[in-house]
């Protein structure tokens, strides 16, 4: 029931992104296609959001690529589409680069987790959806005592 009342954010390795109403997945069949993908594409993240997350538009999407680029943009820039659509461009990628990770954070968030590391959300530059990512040192500053 929680799925049907939520909105899902899909992100693919080729940089496509879309919001899909959870109600679209209500079916009597056991298996359904969740999204349309190109032959060389795959889903790297599905994030369950509440309707209020999407309606208020205050959340921020963060995308990280395998080549170390990052891009942040408002969730309000992501279109709500049907599950059968491919999505809209979330990030402009270089030829061999792909999206490695996606998350949604509150704009005031200081950090987020990726591969067991705490990264600094404030170092992800806010730009428009579909922009090129930028190199950024996202490692959290830590103090070490010797």
Segments predicted by a language model, with ranges:
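C-terminal interaction appendages of subunits in large macromolecular complexes
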Residues: 1-146
